[in-house]
């Protein structure tokens, strides 16, 4: 292909992401676009076409961003190439949204016409503006009886500062308005401007391992061109490879002769390990490298930590390998080996939130056939030592004794909660109960308020979201960001089973709530741990002080059933023998603790603690 033809082809490329609050219908709109442009035949089309991970289809959510090339014949008679990137809407996966926006020139901002602007709509709009993207507002679900397009348009104008007077009105369900949306993508989103004559510069935004082709890198070409046979270099490692195949996803892989600046596609180069291709790295030409790498992605620190252990210690190496494979295309997952007296060898893993943790656990169990025990999640604390050294504590069991550190700090977040006026009181009551500090309140319109609190991350990660939804009948939406660490009065609570501390059950709580939480934990464990042949004493302790206890009574085996009546000596002898046996069993017998018990801390909601 000559340069002029390639430049003309580039003018017809449109790269855009579909962003929205969770459940506003991004994936459904993506399905309709694929259907209308005949990218996928009606026979092959299924709901959530781009959500190709089984777990995504099972849960009905988008977890990983996905790109697809769509060919569109526009009303001006020209053929256009769309690269559509579908993104997650859940706050845990906002890093996936920021990654996908870096590969685009425009964003289709989907707003549910019946619900209007929600918390994630706001944060995704800010992400798009940070990336200097053209934003195209779209109102979805206009076929619903409760849809109010005028209300949604005025909210987009007032709250986001975008002109929504001519926002496209569509229905992802019926396909109404999708043709107009496709035309607006052509006219409103600009073509990529990368220089084709410069050295190759491409951003890796995802990578996965294929048994036949090695590592498949999903890339956005910023400058230059790449074709099979070219020698490329990954700038971060300096390693060089020969390109074996380039292509696009449509939505299944389609080989191409060349990828040019502006294209979103894939490259394979016989790379054996995904660790050599970190997400956010820059690919360039080995012979004529570009001067500087692309900015890549900021590393998102984990918000939540949890211990992950195989139920059978022989699976340790399999778990390590599985985590390494997952980490390759989930850059936000962190893990390091750890040992627990109760659970043996495992890993301390860092996640972006509880949904992310659930998803990783389910993927490991489904895709790698592993049986896992997860310990209760915790945040990372800062213990300030007398020397001034800051010790990071991501596992409550590692917290030094109270006298050994000067103060303990925990991460705080700024939480923005959008809520209808009627529920403001309930939201404020909930936040105050979670140690929240009120900051401000913005009235967005006659009906809705944005309530802003600063509160400990530890209070949000457990069941805050569920409680928020139930106290506002599902109308509230939440967005939060870490703002730093604050010193608070925290203590570590150890749980002892038969006087043995179980490190995996330790947790950190505010001193004022410590006793209530310890009592709650003991009574929960009493329900969850099955009865044994010996008595199990459950105790909660701060240091050496026991603050709560519960007892699981043993099974009583009737050892006297075969004695004839009237032989009290024989009876007493057998009961004494049973007692001795139980005593021995108690000293050697390990209490069997089920998985539910390790997650019990999640179920200690405040109503239970307050005895309601």
From Swiss-Prot:
Membrane topology of this protein: Peripheral membrane protein
GO biological process entries: positive regulation of translation
PROSITE patterns registered for this protein in UniProt: G_TR_2
Chemical reaction(s) catalysed: GTP + H2O = GDP + phosphate + H(+)
Domain tr-type G: 11-193
Keyword GTP-binding listed: yes
One GO CC term, this protein: plasma membrane
Chief place where the protein resides: membrane
EC number: 3.6.5.n1
Domain of life: Bacteria
UniProt GO molecular function: GTP binding; GTPase activity; ribosome binding; translation elongation factor activity
Subcellular location: Cell membrane
Assigned keywords, A-Z: Cell membrane, GTP-binding, Hydrolase, Membrane, Nucleotide-binding, Protein biosynthesis
Protein's UniProt keywords contain Hydrolase: yes
Entries under SUPFAM superfamilies matching the protein: EF-G C-terminal domain-like, P-loop containing nucleoside triphosphate hydrolases, Translation proteins
Binding site for GTP: 23-28, 140-143
Function: Required for accurate and efficient protein synthesis under certain stress conditions. May act as a fidelity factor of the translation reaction, by catalyzing a one-codon backward translocation of tRNAs on improperly translocated ribosomes. Back-translocation proceeds from a post-translocation (POST) complex to a pre-translocation (PRE) complex, thus giving elongation factor G a second chance to translocate the tRNAs correctly. Binds to ribosomes in a GTP-dependent manner.
Family according to the record: Belongs to the TRAFAC class translation factor GTPase superfamily. Classic translation factor GTPase family. LepA subfamily.
PANTHER family (alphabetical): TRANSLATION FACTOR GUF1 HOMOLOG, CHLOROPLASTIC (PTHR43512:SF4), TRANSLATION FACTOR GUF1-RELATED (PTHR43512)
Protein name in UniProt: Elongation factor 4
Gene from which this protein is expressed: lepA
């Amino acid at each position: 292909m000559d340069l002029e033809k390639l430049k003309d082809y580039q003018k017809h490329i449109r790269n855009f992401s579909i962003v929205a609050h969770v459940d506003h219908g991004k994936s459904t709109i993506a399905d309709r676009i694929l259907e209308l442009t005949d990218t996928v035949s009606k026979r092959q089309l299924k709901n959530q076409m781009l959500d190709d991970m089984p777990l995504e289809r099972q849960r009905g959510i988008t977890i990983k961003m996905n790109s697809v090339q769509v060919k569109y014949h526009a009303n001006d008679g020209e053929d256009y190439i769309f690269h559509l990137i579908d993104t997650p809407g859940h706050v845990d996966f906002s890093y996936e949204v920021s990654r996908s926006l870096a590969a685009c020139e425009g964003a289709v901002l989907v707003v549910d016409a019946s619900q209007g602007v929600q918390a994630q709509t706001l944060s995704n709009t800010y992400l798009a503006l940070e990336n200097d993207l053209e934003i195209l507002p779209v109102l979805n679900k206009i076929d619903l009886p409760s849809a109010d397009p005028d209300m949604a348009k005025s909210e987009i104008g007032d709250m986001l500062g975008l002109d929504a007077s001519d926002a496209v009105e569509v229905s992802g369900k019926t396909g109404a308005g999708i043709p107009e949306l496709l035309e607006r993508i052509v006219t409103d989103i600009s073509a990529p401007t990368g220089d084709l004559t410069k050295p190759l510069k491409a951003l890796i935004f995802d990578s996965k391992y294929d048994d036949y082709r090695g590592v498949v890198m999903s890339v956005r070409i910023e400058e230059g061109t790449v074709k099979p046979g070219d020698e490329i270099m990954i700038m971060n490692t300096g390693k060089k490879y020969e390109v074996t195949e380039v292509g696009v996803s449509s939505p299944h892989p389609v080989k191409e002769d060349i990828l040019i600046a502006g294209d979103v596609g894939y490259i394979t180069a016989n790379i054996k390990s995904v660790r050599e291709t970190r997400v956010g790295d820059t690919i360039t030409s080995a012979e004529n490298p570009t001067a500087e790498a692309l900015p890549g992605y900021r590393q998102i620190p984990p918000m939540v930590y949890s211990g992950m252990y195989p139920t059978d210690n022989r699976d340790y190496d399999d778990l390590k390998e599985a985590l390494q494979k997952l980490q390759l295309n989930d850059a936000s997952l962190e893990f390091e080996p750890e040992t627990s007296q109760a659970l043996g060898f495992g890993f301390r893993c860092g996640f972006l939130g509880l949904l992310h943790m659930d998803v990783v656990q389910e993927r490991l169990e489904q895709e790698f056939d592993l049986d896992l025990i997860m310990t209760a999640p915790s945040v990372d604390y800062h213990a300030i030592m007398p020397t001034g050294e800051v010790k990071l504590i991501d596992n409550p069991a590692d917290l030094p004794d109270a006298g050994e550190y000067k103060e303990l700090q925990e991460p705080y977040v700024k939480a923005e909660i959008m809520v209808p006026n009627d529920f403001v009181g309930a939201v404020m009551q909930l936040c105050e109960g979670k140690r929240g500090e009120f900051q401000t309140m913005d009235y967005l319109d006659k009906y809705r308020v944005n309530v802003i609190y600063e509160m400990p991350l530890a209070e949000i990660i457990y069941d805050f979201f569920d409680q928020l939804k139930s106290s506002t009948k599902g109308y509230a939406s939440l967005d939060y960001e870490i703002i730093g660490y604050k010193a608070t009065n925290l203590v570590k609570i150890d749980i002892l089973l038969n006087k043995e501390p179980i490190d995996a059950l330790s947790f950190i709580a505010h001193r004022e709530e410590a006793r209530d939480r310890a009592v709650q934990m003991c009574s929960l464990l009493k329900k969850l741990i099955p009865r044994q042949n010996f008595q199990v004493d459950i105790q909660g302790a701060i240091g050496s002080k026991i603050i709560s206890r519960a007892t699981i009574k043993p099974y009583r085996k009737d050892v006297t059933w075969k004695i004839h009546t009237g032989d009290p000596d024989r009876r007493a002898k057998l009961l004494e023998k049973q007692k001795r046996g139980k005593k021995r069993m108690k000293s050697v017998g390990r209490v069997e603790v089920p998985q539910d018990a390790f997650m019990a801390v999640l179920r200690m909601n405040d109503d239970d603690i307050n005895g309601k």
